[in-house]
Amino acid sequence: MNIDIKISLYKLVHCKFFDPDQMNIFLKSLKGIAEETRLRILALCGKTELSVSELTSILNQSQPRVSRHLKLLVEAGLLERFREGPWAFYRASEKDRPDGFAPALLALIPLNDPVFEEDRARLEMVRQNRISKAESFFKQNAKEWDGIRRLH
């Protein structure tokens, strides 16, 4: 077992609860990851910000199902939701929590597992698709770009 995993396990096992609410936060976080799809989502959102449609594509699951998992992860404090224009994106929580749970958990995810490896391969395809769409958009709109920027 490498030193990073030992440190993460230590942090996970020795979480300090500063008040009764901390215990509830910790238990809610445990419930939040108590399902394979949610653990996969957390691993993906620990790498980059993703939209619901991108996650449905990577996970090959329905939008309602992915949205439900995202809701539970946000409520557990493991993911953050933010809007960018009409889209909602999710990322691993950057909030500083005294229990150190989310970073410790991310360090323990078995990334060499075939399921996580497949997810990362599909994530790379999503990233490449984003790049292609952005390049295409700017090629099509380069001449009018100054006018487009004035609209926003």
List where the protein language model places each region:
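Short, hydrophobic-biased segments on the C-terminal half of alpha helices
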Residues: 70-71
